[in-house]
Amino acid sequence: NGTQKIFYSDRRVLYFSTHQYPYYPGTGGLHEIGEGQALGYTVNVPLRRGAVNGTFISAFRKILEPIALAYKPELILVSAGFDTYYQDPLGGMRVTPEGFAAMARVLLNIADQCCSGRVVSVLEGGYNVVGLARSAKATLEEMFDETHYTDKKLNAMEQEADEKNKPVLRSVISGISPYWNVF
């Protein structure tokens, strides 16, 4: 929410967020897509409670990836919050450490194509200490190529997207497509 606010009218930054919605502080809705010349440079994916690995992978591959490849970032900065971990007391989502690693792989693939692999990840949140540690470890292992999620494995994970969030993903694409000729 603070990051979105800082760059809301700045088209030099593409802001992408997946999060439970509605949730505190109430920002991150579908209609929040930037302002002025930066319309379309804020992309919110406001997911319903209980979203699983496949839903997040689908959002990253079907929404973020085509936009990011068109945008061609010089660097990818990740605000790595792990409160979507499936046992987090506040998050309300169902992402596993493998899901976080798979999301990292999608970002790494984008970075390899756009910005010579430059990715910086900053730890933000997560309220289940064990889950945060496992998820951060899985993400780092993927970033250091100790594991490697292939397209085949990402495709399989994506097939497990939960039904209640598929309309959300379609709505995000519909709302953002006037600003990006990639859908």
Residues covered by each model-derived region:
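A general "terminal functional-core" signal
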Residues: 1-183
